[in-house]
Regions:
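Structured beta-strand/loop patches that form or line metal/cofactor-binding pockets in enzymes
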Residues: 1-28, 32-33, 323-325
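Glycine-rich, aromatic-flanked loop segments that form ligand/cofactor-binding clefts
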Residues: 85-125
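Conserved, mostly hydrophobic/aromatic
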Residues: 24, 47, 84, 97, ...
Length: 368
């Protein structure tokens, strides 16, 4: 079997690739380099002359070839390699009529625990905190056992440290009250703070027992990120913008974090993310893949989650279930706060060709 054709799709703000073989079996993948999907498409187009004619089962060889063909690295390149890798695993699963997780060593769980994204910014007003409280209660009633928010007020950069801490505490308190003590809460900072402020804030909210405190600072320095993990008493998570096994190795070797957060659509696909999971396992660190870009990357993440021992919970957005994704046909089944281990061959996602070709491309406004 050989790779015969590669189709690219820019739909909504996403880049999706379809790899078609001479046997008629096709696979789909998606990049998580969501700020620059056109650039990812340009790289995939450059890779076509390398890929066409290749055996799609030679996944590791292709992954290494694409990574090392040119002496350059970066998230756009890795985002392109990642979506190709996911599509190749999809082809392999379909050919052998088995789900991808079975090709990764088999399953170690029958369902995947989710943590629900309740939203990015809730602000600092009483009414918004009341809304957060109600949203948390509803999510728990729907069966979710872990909830995630960005707790910082939207004007965080204009506040004194005292104001920032007090208003963030108020928001976290509303989340904890709505969620109750039987539900885990997760706090995502989106790289907004300095190391000094991060440490102070993390210590101030530890009374609410967050599961972890995620991405407090910019990704510029691995050493600085690891240093925070050593200074605070609540678990730290980061890694969603990293794109190689070596970055994760150095992050962990420098003392942190307790949770690693690769994105399967950015960190080298299923092939490299599985390696990152093993590196993390050797440090007694858990893998919680970053994910909010739709059913393709949710499915790719779930196949990894099912096959590794050091999984805790999977990031999940209800946007996966919205009509906006009607150009994708998903076999994933959510029951309350869990996705049932998929049994369909391959990834379990198909493209609706009639619809995807009509979906407009709406790139992210970088001025927003």
């Amino acid at each position: 079997m050989k790779i015969e054709k590669i189709n690219s799709y820019l739909a909504r703000d996403q880049f999706i690739v379809e790899i078609i073989t001479d046997k008629g079996i096709s696979g789909v993948g998606q990049s998580a380099c969501w700020a620059y999907p056109e650039a990812v498409k340009a790289i995939v187009d450059r890779f076509k002359n390398i890929l066409i004619g290749k055996d799609p089962f030679m996944i590791e060889e292709i992954n290494q070839l694409l990574m090392r063909t040119g002496p350059f690295r970066g998230s756009v390149l890795s985002g392109a390699i990642s979506c190709i890798d996911i599509a190749l695993w999809d082809i392999k699963g379909k050919y052998f009529e088995t789900p991808i997780w079975n090709l990764l060593g088999g399953k170690v769980r029958n369902k995947v625990r989710l943590h629900l994204l309740l939203g990015i910014i809730y602000g600092n007003s009483k009414s918004k905190n009341e809304g957060l409280y109600e949203s948390a209660k509803k999510a728990v009633k729907d069966g979710f056992t872990a909830l995630k928010i960005d707790p910082l007020p939207d004007n965080y950069y204009d506040l004194s440290l005292d104001q920032l801490i007090k208003e963030t505490i108020s928001t976290v308190a509303a989340l904890r009250e709505g969620a109750g003590s039987e539900v885990d809460i997760i706090l995502e900072i989106h790289r907004k703070l300095t190391p000094m402020t991060s440490v102070h804030l993390a210590e101030s909210i530890k009374e609410f027992n967050p599961m972890f405190f995620e991405d407090p600072i910019q990704i510029d320095s691995i050493i600085s990120q690891s240093d925070i993990a050593k200074k605070v008493s609540i678990p730290i998570a980061n890694g969603e913008r990293m794109h190689s096994i070596w970055e994760f190795r150095e992050l962990l070797a420098n003392g942190g974090p307790q949770y690693v957060r690769p994105d399967v659509g950015l960190a080298g696909g299923i092939t490299q993310t599985k390696k990152i999971a093993s590196i993390a396992e050797s440090y007694h660190s858990a893998l919680i893949t970053h994910n909010f870009l739709g059913p393709i990357l949710t499915a790719a993440s779930v196949h990894i989650d099912v096959s590794i021992p050091n999984f805790i919970t999977q990031e999940y957005s209800l946007d996966d279930e919205s009509e906006k994704n009607n150009y994708l046909i998903s076999s994933l089944k959510r029951e309350g706060g869990y996705i049932i281990t998929p049994e369909k061959p391959g990834l379990g996602i198909e493209i609706n060709k009639e619809i995807i070709n009509q979906v407009p491309y709406e790139p992210l406004d970088l001025n927003d």
